[in-house]
């Protein structure tokens, strides 16, 4: 199975149109009511079209979550050192704009509320309480899709920290 398992009925698309002065990319975003496919992943990895995955699934559970730190320029070394010092099970990846995504990957799917709360505690411990956390939703009403996160490894961008 995929490392980024999520909602099966929808995904996100991000098309870059420009860049702000602070380095954050601007673009057209849309949620597509179709499942994530291998072809979409290939297009993403080849740098053809960005892919977003919704971490909360149809059972209101998650296999992964993410702390999204939007600070430019990002203090990569400082945050990575703190993650190691605290023994947090997080993987640092560059975001599309050069910010930081700290991913938590799980062996089993857990309630989105538990994943969200755990990541809030981790973010606070790292000194970034109040930053964006995925999953954003802890439950989905019928027909809702939730918020998606741009996936890492788009073309030659969004690399894992240490692979810069």
Named regions from a protein language model:
Residues 1-64, 72-79, 147-148, 153-156, ...:
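DNA replication initiation on ssDNA origins
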Residues 5-9, 88-92, 130-131:
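Short secondary-structure junctions
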Residues 75-85, 105-131, 157-164:
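Helical (often loop-to-helix) elements that flank the catalytic cores of nucleotide-handling enzymes
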Residues 51-57, 80-81, 86-95, 134-141:
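Catalytic micro-motifs at enzyme active sites that drive phosphoryl/nucleotidyl and oxygen chemistry
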Residues 33-37, 94, 117-123:
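A signal for specific C-terminal beta-sheet/loop modules enriched in small/flexible residues
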Residues 123-159:
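Flexible helix-coil linker/hinge segments at domain or subdomain boundaries
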Residues 66-67, 90-115, 139-154:
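Histidine-centered divalent-metal-coordination microenvironment in nucleic-acid enzymes
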């Amino acid at each position: 199975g995929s490392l980024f398992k999520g909602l099966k009925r929808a995904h996100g698309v991000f098309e870059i149109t420009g860049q702000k002065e602070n380095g954050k990319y601007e673009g057209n975003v849309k949620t597509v009511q179709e499942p994530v496919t291998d072809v979409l992943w290939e297009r993403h990895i080849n740098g053809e079209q960005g892919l977003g995955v919704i971490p909360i699934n149809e059972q209101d559970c998650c296999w992964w979550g993410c702390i999204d730190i939007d600070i430019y320029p990002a203090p990569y070394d400082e945050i990575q050192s703190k993650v190691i010092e605290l023994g947090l099970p997080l993987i640092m990846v560059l975001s599309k704009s050069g910010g930081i995504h700290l991913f938590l990957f799980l062996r089993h799917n857990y309630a989105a509320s538990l994943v969200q709360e755990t990541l809030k505690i981790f973010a606070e411990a790292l000194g970034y309480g109040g930053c964006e956390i995925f999953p954003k939703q802890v439950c989905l009403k019928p027909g809702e899709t939730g918020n998606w996160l741009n996936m890492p490894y788009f073309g030659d961008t969004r690399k894992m920290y240490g692979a810069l």
